[in-house]
A protein has these predicted regions:
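Conserved metal-binding segment of the jelly-roll/cupin
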Residues: 91, 130-147
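Non-heme Fe(II)/2-oxoglutarate
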Residues: 1-79
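A short hydrophobic beta-strand segment most commonly corresponding to one strand
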Residues: 111-113, 154-170
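A short glycine-rich, His/Asp/Glu-containing loop-to-beta-strand
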Residues: 74-93
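Short beta-strand His + acidic residue motifs that chelate non-heme Fe in jelly-roll/DSBH
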Residues: 99-100, 145-153
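Double-stranded beta-helix
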Residues: 3, 123, 162-175
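A short beta-strand-loop-beta hairpin characteristic of the jelly-roll/cupin
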Residues: 94-99, 106, 114-133
């Protein structure tokens, strides 16, 4: 099931995130969006590019910016984290769907938090499209194939991608 929650964070918490990630001081790493064999055939391998800011990996925060995400973590049902990263996809002349994929090879929850509004979206194998609206959080089971896109009406599309465990995935009692 796909769950969409608008105005997910309080305005103050969201404004802090937006300010930090729209500053020129973020340490971005350049990387592929998907493996070349996963990329949508209409997307040139030359356009298989995004900028990434890892926040949480290998069971620990890997960025001083982790603290900005604590309010979001408190609003999810996360009991354990697998990964958090921020993706910056540059504007393209037309919207490209990058290609259907899953983020992990095991069952957990995947979430996308939209940091800016733009004409990009997240699409799912069943045809569902979730528009990129700032301060929106969409969550779904990690076995659901999904695709991000580029955008055409902003300089970039900026999202946070999180993979996490809820109690039901690790046999903990629900509260």
């Amino acid at each position: 099931m796909i769950e969409i929650k608008d105005n997910f964070l309080d305005k103050e918490d969201f404004d802090k995130i937006k300010e930090v990630y729209n500053s020129p001081n973020i340490p971005w790493a350049m990387g592929d969006i998907l493996y070349d064999d996963e990329i949508n055939s209409e997307v040139s391998i030359l356009d298989n590019l995004q900028f990434i800011n890892p926040v949480y990996s290998m069971n620990q925060p890997v960025s001083q910016l982790f603290e900005y995400w604590i309010p979001l973590l408190k609003k999810t049902k996360a009991v354990a984290l697998y990964s958090i990263k921020i993706n910056l996809n540059p504007r393209t002349p037309k919207i490209y769907e990058h290609g259907l994929h899953t983020d992990t090879g095991f069952m957990c929850k995947t979430g996308v938090f939209y940091i800016n509004s733009n004409d990009g979206y997240t699409s799912f194998e069943d045809g569902t499209k979730v528009e990129s609206v700032e301060n929106r959080f969409v969550s779904f089971n990690s076995d659901m194939k999904h695709s991000g896109t580029s955008c055409t009406n902003q300089k970039y599309r900026l999202v946070m991608n999180i993979n996490y465990f809820e109690a039901k995935f690790i046999n903990l009692p629900h509260k």
